[in-house]
Amino acid sequence: TTNGAAKEICVALSATNGTQLWAAVMDDALYPQGGVGLDDGPRTTPAVADGSVFVLSSYLKLYRLNATNGAILWQRNLASLYGGTIIAHQNCASPVIEGALLFLNANTGTSTLMALHLADGSPAWRSQDEALTHSTPVLATIHGVRQIIFVTQSNLVSLNPQSGALLWRFA
């Protein structure tokens, strides 16, 4: 808790001895439909690249932290920026990184599947109108074609990771 309010916290531990290196306070830790109880979260896994830790909170807030000291380098409230909505049990999908892009489903009103630039969190592309699930996207090469695959509420959707162009959809 911070000032009496429950908060989601990202913690870095030493790989050598497990001691805490730093802790960064992120977002509110309120889980009214948490399934198990009010303390059932967060459920996402941070992604690490370019000396940074990227964290997507239960309430669709994306943070870039300095991997050395946990300082917040930038943050984006995806729900506010893109009209996203929080689903029951909050977000559970983790961000995925390849090269200079971070992939996620922000559950925005339109063009929900997106890639953001690691450097500043600005959109590289947004594509498709697909409702969020608790599934983390997967990068794969299938028949020689690199793709980012999302499980959504209605479909399995594959996109070109560089452009966001639809490769295939399975309902």
Predicted regions mapped to residue ranges:
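Noncatalytic, solvent-exposed loop/strand surfaces
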Residues: T1-A171
